[in-house]
Swiss-Prot record:
The keyword Amino-acid biosynthesis is annotated on this UniProt entry: no
Gene field: fldA
PANTHER family, per database record: FLAVODOXIN 1, FLAVODOXIN 2
Flavodoxin-like domain segment(s): 4-165
Name of the molecule in the record: Flavodoxin
Species this protein is from: Haemophilus influenzae (strain ATCC 51907 / DSM 11121 / KW20 / Rd)
GO molecular function terms attached to this record: electron transfer activity; FMN binding
Amino acid sequence: MAIVGLFYGSDTGNTENIAKQIQKQLGSDLIDIRDIAKSSKEDIEAYDFLLFGIPTWYYGEAQADWDDFFPTLEEIDFTDKLVGIFGCGDQEDYADYFCDAIGTVRDIIEPHGAIVVGNWPTEGYNFEASKALLEDGTFIGLCIDEDRQPELTAERVEKWCKQIYDEMCLAELA
């Protein structure tokens, strides 16, 4: 078993593709990828280092498989677990809800002890509002817009992976 569990939900394949890019960047020896639709509470509890991939749909809605899993997520003790969150959204058509689902996940796991890592700058994005925003003006995790900025995805994923690698101290564990 790898030391980082990456759990994602995806309807169109965009978030799944990002998950695979992250695994490629960080290494399959470090990252296990799992579809949240086929995952259990015990699957998540098995890891101290987690990455959650969740797209935002329409007016701030979570992807359906994640939405179904939220009650289970609320039962998990995340004390001392490091969690990075990434997701896809559309900053133009849904500018008032850009990557809201990332913020929704944070709102569920932080009260249960999660240490969320991987804050991401908002520079280069054009949106109105997001539940993923922190008080310091950064996103709580990596926001990807495959609809409007697909040409920036590879670079953003690469930079975020380097950041996650450092913040989770994965070099010391590999």
